[in-house]
Amino acid sequence: MTSEEFPSFTVGPEAIEHFNVNGWLLTEPLEGSQVALLQSWIDEIELWDDNGEWLHYRESTVHGPRLCRTENFVPFHDALGSFLTTGVLLDTASALLGEPAVLYKEKINYKAAGGGGYAPHQDAPAYRFIETHVSCMIAIDDSLVSNGCLEVVSAAHREVLDMDETGCITDELVASFKWAPVEVLAGQALWFHSRTPHRSGANTSPVSRRAIYPTYNAASEGDLRERYYEQKLAEFADAGDTGSRVSLIGDFQGVMIE
């Protein structure tokens, strides 16, 4: 269940103020049959092969190789693309940014049983071209402490924090923060600022814990989605990476399969 520390909000003045103060917001954009439909779309994408223009990433687990992430799927799945670029999600992103929003990037994290977690980090250092973004984690399956739910730090999103050589938050700062786990039920969405510190543990449960993570920027700064993916792949190529990373920072703690 959602704890009292993380109440769910309807997006309005109170919710926007909560986001501005704390750097996160829990909402409920889906219900009932909508959740089942979204789950079926993710099931479809999981079955895509590795030869398309979308980006699949795989990790090694104690249960064998598993898909850990898919990116750049919006152009190839009309229904999911529409869900992420119109309607309640875009409206919420616009409200939190204070102006019309546009999709910047999207990913699905599958977090299979035995799948790796993510080290404490902020998203902003991995995002190019613009200063402020807002992301959300839409739970496809219940995201619980037992399967590696997100943990956040409230009211710590005013600046980019000191980082180590991997681009993650330094151990000294990590130890100084109060980290709070946020359990997010299927169909709920946890919104967070691009500078909100967050992390997640490995999935020690016997089942996957999937989530979609769309990120939005202010439309006034441009539609930069294609440029983001071009830049990401170029930076991977320049660094000689052939599937050894999922991010432009070193936050993923799983064992990648190249």
What feature does the model see in each segment?
Residues 121-133, 177-178, 184, 207:
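A short beta-loop-beta micro-motif enriched in histidine and acidic residues
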